[in-house]
Structure formats: structure tokens, C-alpha cells
Amino acid sequence: MSISNILNWFGKRGVEVYDYDSDYQIKNIGNIVIPEKLTSKNAFLLSNSVPEIFFPIDFYADRISKLIFIIENKSGREVASSELNRLISDEINPLFSFSDLVYNYVFSLLSDGNAINYLQVPSLYKTISPNTIERWDVLQPNLVEIGEHANINILNISSLKELIKKAQYLQGSGLRQDLQIDRLRIHNVGMKRRGNSVIFSEGLLWKANKSIDTLLAVYSARYNVYANNGAAGYLAHKATANTNSDLEAVIAGANKREQILKDINERNGITGRRNLWGVSGVPIEFVKTLATINELMPFEETLEDSIKIASVFQIPPVLVPRKDQSTYDNQENAERNVWENGLLSMAATVCQNLTKMFGITGNVKIGFDASNVSSLTQNESTNQDLIAKQLTNLEKMKQLNPEIDINQVITEIFNNYGKY
């Protein structure tokens, strides 16, 4: 029996595809389904199923959702008695708390690149305003189907509804609900659009798409090693005589060699649903294919990929979870830096978007209070200690330099240490 016949008998040719979509292929990995590569259609699902992708997005969504949201005036002071407080309370949705809605909003925005909001008003009202909005929902992005009008100059439109032809929401039971276009509010992150769409953005995860694709390949390879019990290589009878083997006759022709290589590569490997071992009809020794857990070094690879994905969100390596649960002395400073360089500005963006979405105008807006953030509070306490020490030295400074402007020095002290 020839090698080709043996291989054809041994298993099906090629990689077995379980589901196919025009945008990506899905392969069965154990009890879960993992797409081969990051796409615009699976970014949200990957963020909810792969820990290395989930971590940085949850890092932002969880911390921002736990902030204290307030209605404030232009000077930043809370307007406690405002009727607008209803919009940032648990009254705004019967299924989710306001904190849950903010979490869903940030998670969708950072994972999919888009937060799809739906506002509802009583049927007797025709316009959406802060006084008429009775419900706010953050729709799961992978369950929303939006048809866009083609050949429209986006520079000439005045509202989002001019771009949307039809919008539907798919519920878990298979029910399709038509959405009123004028109640949709879609917020994006990033300028780059998704494919031919002028509504949806590509999202931040695409800045690490190579690392994500590598990460998914590592998961696929690890599964195959475990599922196939670690066997890796070709098993054959070893030649005992110094004579020409059947292999020389088989590979004499270039076309035959190409056919053999193609046949082996399509069926054998450590990714997809391919075999980790094969059977040869010619006298060769066991050939190792390096498909062992130790040699794959999966934990080192996934950690490297995780660090690169987290860096997109300005999260330093010391905050990325590790298999040994190691901690670092500078983790506290690192988290404070993430707040100062990323989280605070993201929280401000969320407040600006919600203020505009609810139609809040005039001298008030939605803001947040970060006084419950321990890393920022500790930094503020440190700054207050520094201010106190600086102020106690003013008299000595005046004695050493009588011409010094005390008021100017005080102003400089508060400019340097008065804010976190």
C-alpha cells in the first residue's frame, strides 16, 4: 500500500470545518468554539470568552462602572436636587442597574468598538428629551443587525437615521425585533471604520490583532496536544539492512513529492482538527514533531500576547495576571498611573457621551466623583502632606529670601500638588 493510500485510509483529508460564515470560520475546540482569527463579527464574543482579552476590557468597564455618577454644573459642583438624577439612577432600566448599564456600555465600546444604545419614551411622546426618556438599554452588539444605505455622502447628512435603512435586534429565543431608527444612539471608539460601513468603527482590539490571532492559535495547539494525549510523530518499522528503501522510489518524481507533502500537511499538525501522528509504509524511525506542552511554551506565549493586548489600553505588564500570581511592589503606582493616563479620561468620555445622548443641555451635565477610588485617594493624601510641609517652610523661605513673593509660591505649590 502506498503512502498516499495509507494516509487516505487513515482519516479525512484537510481540516474539518464545523461552521462557515462569509467573514470567518469557526472550529470546534473541546466544549467551546474559538474562531481562528479576530474579526469584526467575533470581537465581542472573544472578549467574553478568552481571559487574556477579557482582562483589560473588564479592567476599564468594572472600575468606571463603580464610580459615583452625578449631575453637576459647569464648575463641577454636584446639583443634588436635579430632576435629571433619574437618568443616572436604577430607575432608567427595569433589568439592569445604572452601574450595570455603564459596565455594558464601556465593555461593548472597548471590545466591539461600538456601543449601541436604545432609548425608549412613552407612546404619547414623539420627541426624545431628558423629560420623556423612560428607559435606556445597551444592546449586545453581536445581536444587532443594521442595514446601511449605500452611496450616501456622509459629509451631507445631518443625523444618524439618514444612514440606516433597517435595524433589528435578535433575542435569545430567535425573535427579531424591529428597532425604531430615531431611538438608536451609536457611539464609536477610534476613527477607522469597519469594512464598508460608515456607522461602525473597527475598535481598539485591532491594534493587537496579531497577538490575538497568535493567542488563539496557541489555545488550539494546546487543546490538540491534550486531546490526543501528547502523541506526536510518525511510527514506522526501522530499516535493518543497508539497502535502498521504498521511500526512494516513492519520491523519485517531483509531482509525487508535492502530493505527499500536501497530503501530510493538510492532515497532520497541531492546529485545527488535524492529527498529531501518522503511519508510514516506508522504513523510517520515529520523527518527533515538537508537539509537547513544554516545547510549545504556551504560558510564556500567552503571557507575552496578554501583555501586548493590555498595552493597547495603557495597562502595564505588572498588572497583567500571571500563572504564579506574582505581585510587584510598584503595582499600586501602576494602577494609579492607569487611572491618571486612561481611566479618568475614559470616564470623562462616558459622561460626555451620556450627556449628549440624553439630550442634557444648559448649565448642567453628567459627571463623576472619584473619591471612592483608593489609589487616587491615597495619592491625594500624599499630595496634601506635601502641601502642608511646603507651607510650613514658607517662613524660612521668607527669611532666606525677603524679596520672595509668598502668594506666587503658594499658587505654585497648589498647582503642583493640588490635584491627583
Predicted features by range, described:
Residues A61, V102-Y105, A249-G272, L290-D385, ...:
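C-terminal amphipathic alpha-helical
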